[in-house]
Amino acid sequence: MELNSLRPALGSTKNRKRIGRGIGSGHGKTATKGHKGQKARSGGSIKPGFEGGQMPLQRRLPKRGFRPLDRNEYVLINLQQLDVFEAGSCVDRDAMNAKGLLKKSDLPIKVLANGDLTKALTIKADKFSKSAIDKIQAAGGKIEGISAC
């Protein structure tokens, strides 16, 4: 066997369909488009969503709601999740990431007051709820962050 005598396995390759190249090719004359009709014309494709003149589904269904362009999205962290840290430790983005608390680490963090905090922690976050601030301070912890809402 030599490299110049290698051939693809039988049935593994197909010949390209050359349309409009004479009746001997089997794909001449109408070039596989059939006779007349919309699909035989140039530019005769039917647009996506067209239902033959019936009111299309995307126009039959009502419009609903909107998404505000200036909406701020936060990663929400509850106090009960922060209770896994040791007392006196500093809890910031890196520490939360290490414990697997942040799914989307690029978003700002907001601390909510769900659950109880039993240890004094120094928590660094972008936002805190008022009740979360009260609970953290009641447990003897400190808050470091951009703002408290």
Curated annotation (Swiss-Prot):
GO terms for cellular component: cytosolic large ribosomal subunit. Residues 30-39 have a biased composition (Basic residues). Keywords: Ribonucleoprotein, Ribosomal protein, RNA-binding, rRNA-binding. One of its GO terms (molecular function) is structural constituent of ribosome. Binds to the 23S rRNA. Belongs to the universal ribosomal protein uL15 family. This is Large ribosomal subunit protein uL15. It comes from Trichlorobacter lovleyi (strain ATCC BAA-1151 / DSM 17278 / SZ).
